[in-house]
Structure formats: C-alpha cells, structure tokens
Regions:
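Membrane-proximal envelope and lipid/glycan-remodeling enzymes
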Residues: 1-529
Length: 529
C-alpha cells in the first residue's frame, strides 16, 4: 500500500497541474454553501448546475475555513482520503473474489499506474471519490457473502454512491436488485426482513434528498442532465465510439479476460462485478459518452476490472501449481504479458498511441484555458458589479471567481437554456444553446471569446468586437446589440493588455474610470461617436 501511494504521488508530480472549467461550476456551489448563501450558483442563481451533491457538500467543508478561497486545493485535500479508500477497497475486493494477498497487492499497484485516475484526482472533480465509493460498495457487497456484518456497510456505501453523482443510481440500483434477489432466493422470512431493515433507511434518506432537491431547484433532474439530453439522439454512435475507444486504447478488455475463468470456478462475487462492468458500459453507450480527455465515464469500472484480472490470475496460477502440471512454470507466467500490456496502455507518461497523445494534448489545453479564464476574471471584476448578469460560456471559473450573476451559455447551470434550448452551432456533447431565450434572460454584460485578454490594439471597430462575441450572430436575431449595448474595455496600462466587453445601455452615459489596482475602464468607440 505504501509503495502504491508513493507511485501515485510520483505520478501526480509528473503529470503536474490539471484543471478543467467544469470543476469550478461545482466549486461555485460549494463556495456559496460555505459562505452561508446556500447551494446556489455564482451570485444567487438557484439552479442545480451540479450533478455531484455529496462532493459539493464535502468541498464546502474546508471552504468554510478558507472563506471560499482555494477551492481546487481544498478539493484535492478532500479527495486524498478517497485515494486511500480506493486502494484499500480494490485490495479487499480482489481478496473477496479469490486473489491471494500478493495478487491483491498487485491490484493496488496497478491503480498507481493509471494516468486517468491521477488526472481525475488532480482536476478536483468528483471522479476519483466516486470511483472509490463504487469500488468500496462492491467490495463490501462481495465481502458480505462471507460475513453478514458487511451488509450495512454495503448499503450505506451504495447510498453514498448515489449521492456522489446523480447517475450513481446505476450501481446502487444494481446492488439493491442483487441483494433483493439473494434474499428472495433463500426463501427465508428472516433474510427478507434483514434485507428490508438494512436497505430501508438508505432508501428513505435518498428519497428525502431527491424530493428536497426537486423542490428546491424546481427540476426533476439536474440541469446538466437536460443540457446533454440531446446527445444520444443527435449523435447516436458517439456513446459506442467512446466506449470502444476507451476499452481498446486503454486495454480495459484485459480485465475481462479472466472473467470467464472465474465464472467457470463459480465465484459469485466475480459474477456480480463483471455483470456490473457490462451494465455500466451499456449505460455509457446509451447516454452518449463524454468529452473530457481522461475516460471519466468508464473510470468507475477500472478498479473492478483490475480486481477481476488479479483474482483470475491468482486462481489460475494456484490451480496450475496444485495440478503439478509439467508446464506449470510456463503457464504461470502466461498472464505476465497481459499485465505488462495493461500497464503500458494505462500509463500515459512514457509510451502513447495517437489517441493517448490527443488526450494529453486535450488535458494541456483545458489547463491552459482555465489559467486564461482566471486571469480574465480579474479584469471582469473591474467592471461587472455584484449581481450583474454576465453571459459566458466559461461558467465554472467566472461563476466561482467573479460576483456576477452568470448566464451560463451551455445550459449546464442555466435551467432555461437546458430545458428549452437546441444545439444550433454547437456539439451536443457540450450542452445546448438557446438564442431565443436571451430577451427573457435579460443579459447586461457579454465578453469576447478567447483569448479574452488581448494586447492592444485588439479591435478597430464595434463590428470587430461583436464578431468576437460567441454566438452574437444567433443571439443578434433577438437582441439588437448595436442599439442596446455599448462596447467597453478593461485596460491594464502597465502591460498594454485589455479585455473587451459589451455593456447594456441604461440611459446614462458610459463614464471612464480607474481602479486602485491600476485598471482603466473606458469605452473607446463611444467617445468616437
């Protein structure tokens, strides 16, 4: 375990800083909760723009003491115990499925080589904690086959899975169904009552939470769900292509190689784990996959696959040696190339295919983008007042690090766009857009597309600026930008850089100003008129 922890830390250091804007959407809710404003987005926007309730609450805990500062760092701090839980859980799962102590330890070591798990941890998203809870829930369930005391742990772990991510109902529902069938199969009234006593409290908690969030936010499911609901309809092959690429390029198929052996050996725990892996992959195909460059949707099955592979290897080698076969040493070494290939495919630090290089490039791009958004937030804070309605497609960072009331353009954190929008001009795996919704949303500020902060002179006319506001052509069918908005800029004279924005006219003249930090806010094209 210590060796695996050391390798994981070394892997994190080698990968370096990883950030994704979507993580900061959840951080915005956590920050507001920590500051006593409730689980709302940006400045008082009541929308369920997160699908990770439990993680949102956990990240809020340390933010109470930092007064909302350093959300990414605090998320990593809160994620560290889940790294330990993941290592312990995959060890227990492998042991419960029949692996020897040594092979179970190998299973833990495999986790430390998985770059996607490292990236998931570094982003501060719920990904790794969710993976850890799923693994723990299955480890506790399989362990309960031999020790009934683990049933309560399994039940509450299943609830934690369902609260950690909205689609946690998939593993939790499968576990509930399995426990029910097991209890009914015994045809014992005592077993059925034990099942009800164990499971009922967790179901009550889940139903109470679900009803609360439905009442509080007003939608049956989070806006993130509605924002991406069109993906499987408009790109019906996207989910299959996503799963196929992850399974083949990441060599995840290696984990299922030994599953038939365990089924033949009648390992009930392995049957459950392998069945869930298949169900989970089918679910990901149905919802259309994901765009994030670290296999996020398939990661919950990775530790389970490692446990299956190590358990099958351990049992196979043990069987070969007990049979005292003449070629037992050769047969015992047969799984070694499989393990070597798996390590090469999951570790992206050294040898990479074009697919993996593309993902690493995507990670670097996302990290660079977030740094640019953070810098832009400092400029926008000079002009957008508290509660000002700012339209942006970078809702995470700007929702977390400005005090604007964000109109999030993808619908991830905007219920109006999520439920009424379409996909005009966008890919549905990112969300929706709704140009016709903007008169109702009453925007007050827009900003230019990346790079938001540019060296002067950046634009020569109002038309140049409008052409660099995302979706201004579509939104312009419903809002007269030239009549209702003026073009301004936040200038940093020391560096010669500026961020251009649109500000809604309210009848009063636009007056230039200078902040204590040396920023100048002016309206260059207004003064020329």
């Amino acid at each position: 375990m210590m060796a695996a922890a050391g390798l994981f830390v070394a892997h994190c250091i080698r990968i370096g800083d990883v950030t994704i804007d979507d993580a900061f959407i959840t951080f915005s809710f956590s920050k507001n909760l920590a500051l006593g404003h409730g689980p709302v987005f940006s400045h008082g926007v009541r929308v369920e723009g997160y699908s990770t309730f439990l993680w949102m609450v956990l990240v809020a805990l340390p933010l109470v003491f930092t007064r909302g500062a350093a959300p990414l760092g605090m998320a990593r701090v809160m994620g560290a115990p889940f790294v330990a839980l993941l290592g312990w859980s995959v060890y227990r799962l492998a042991r419960a499925c029949g692996a020897s102590r040594r092979m179970a330890a190998v299973c833990v070591l495999l986790l430390s080589f998985d770059t996607d798990l490292v990236v998931g941890y570094l982003t501060g998203m719920e990904t790794l904690p969710y993976v850890a809870l799923v693994t723990f829930a299955f480890a506790a369930t399989v362990q309960s086959f031999f020790d009934a005391r683990w049933q309560k742990w399994a039940a509450w772990a299943g609830l934690a899975v369902a609260l950690m991510r909205i689609d946690g109902f998939v593993p939790w529902g499968m576990l509930l169904g399995w426990w029910f069938l097991m209890a009914m199969g015994k045809r014992d009234a005592i077993e059925i009552k034990r099942f009800v006593r164990t499971v009922a409290p967790t179901v009550v908690v889940y139903v109470a939470w679900f009803l609360w969030r439905w009442h509080y936010y007003g939608l049956f499911l989070p806006s993130t769900y509605y924002a991406k609901a069109l993906l499987p309809k408009l790109l019906p092959n996207n989910g299959f292509e996503y799963v196929t690429a992850e399974v083949l390029e990441g060599a995840l198929w290696c984990g299922l190689v030994g599953w038939p052996w365990l089924l033949w050996r009648r390992r009930l725990g392995a049957a459950l784990v392998g069945l869930y892996v298949i169900v989970h992959w089918i679910y990901v195909v149905r919802v259309g996959g994901d765009w994030m460059p670290f296999g996020r949707f398939l990661l919950p099955t990775v530790p389970l696959l490692f446990a299956l592979l190590c358990s099958a290897t351990s049992d196979f080698v043990g069987t070969v040696f007990r049979a005292r076969h003449r070629l037992r040493w050769l047969l015992a070494l047969a799984p070694v190339p499989l393990f070597a290939w798996l390590v090469v495919r999951i570790d992206h630090r050294f040898v990479n295919s074009d697919f993996e290089k593309g993902r690493l490039s995507g990670i670097a791009d996302q990290t660079a983008n977030v740094k640019a958004y953070l810098r832009a937030a400092g400029f926008l804070n000079q002009v957008v007042p508290s509660g000002g309605r700012l339209v942006t497609d970078y809702g995470g960072v700007l929702g977390c690090f400005t005090d604007a009331s964000i109109i999030e353009m993808w619908g991830l954190a905007n219920a109006t766009i999520a439920t009424r929008g379409d996909t005009e001009g966008v890919r549905p795996n990112y969300g929706r857009t709704c140009a016709a919704c903007y008169p109702e949303l009453k925007p007050e500020y827009f900003h230019v597309m990346v790079p938001m902060v540019r060296r002067e002179p950046a634009f020569a006319s109002v038309d140049d600026v409008l052409a660099n506001v995302w979706q201004s052509d579509a939104i312009g069918r419903y809002i007269d930008f030239k009549r209702d908005f003026g073009v301004g800029r936040v200038l940093q004279p020391r560096t010669g850089e500026a961020l251009y924005f649109l500000r809604k006219r309210d009848g009063s003249p636009f007056t230039p100003s200078k902040s204590e930090r040396g920023f100048v806010v002016d309206y260059p094209f207004e003064t020329r008129q």
